[in-house]
Amino acid sequence: MLELLKVSITGDLSSGKTEASRVFQDLGAYVISADKVSHSFLVPHSHIGRRVIDLLGPEVVVDNAFDRKVIAEKVFDNLVLLQALEAILHPEVRRIIEEQYYQVAKERKHPLFIAEVPLLYEIHYAKWFDRVILITADENIRRERFTKKTNCSDLNFYQRCARFSSNEEKKMHADIVIENNGTKEELRHKVEEYFYALKGAL
């Protein structure tokens, strides 16, 4: 029997998901990121890469690699294209996350399995996990973090936020809600508390 708790971290854009995941990793949890997984397998000459090129056109490949800025420009204003792209990528992301979970569980080296999945509810993936942690922050704080980190405009922030479902709705379904309106140190203390609570959950 695999006795390793499956925990997903999710939340809106620039809420602090990655920072929370980093704290869990520092404490000994195994952490996998859905975004990093998709980056790892999305190469032009792979089967999935060819499907993406067929969908979006050859101009999304620059210097034998996918240009993520070009992809973003193509899909963020086109819901049909965005959904078609996600239909290609998300099943593979899920397959890799689940495959990795079973490998990590067999090794018995980590107290928790953490998957950072930004669009967890939007892709109907929450039920696979034993616990869901929702990281939240006020919109003005998230906007400031996003624009400072990316040098993108407020408009770009709101366009990207449109992909996420209602935060209030997600709060109703999450097992744990961590508010992240303060400092990184404050977030760390909150995550540490939940780490030890979850560690003893099985």
Curated annotation (Swiss-Prot):
Its EC number is 2.7.1.24. Residues 6-202 form the DPCK domain. Catalyzes the phosphorylation of the 3'-hydroxyl group of dephosphocoenzyme A to form coenzyme A. GO terms for biological process: coenzyme A biosynthetic process. It is found in: Cytoplasm. This is Dephospho-CoA kinase. ATP binds at S14, S15, G16, K17, T18, E19. Pathway: Cofactor biosynthesis; coenzyme A biosynthesis; CoA from (R)-pantothenate: step 5/5. It catalyses: 3'-dephospho-CoA + ATP = ADP + CoA + H(+). PANTHER family: BIFUNCTIONAL COENZYME A SYNTHASE-RELATED, DEPHOSPHO-COA KINASE-RELATED. One of its GO terms (molecular function) is ATP binding. It holds the Pfam family CoaE. Keywords: ATP-binding, Coenzyme A biosynthesis, Cytoplasm, Kinase, Nucleotide-binding, Transferase. GO terms for cellular component: cytoplasm. InterPro entries: Depp_CoAkinase (IPR001977), P-loop_NTPase (IPR027417). Coiled coil: none annotated. Its main location: cytoplasm. Belongs to the CoaE family. It comes from the Bacteria.
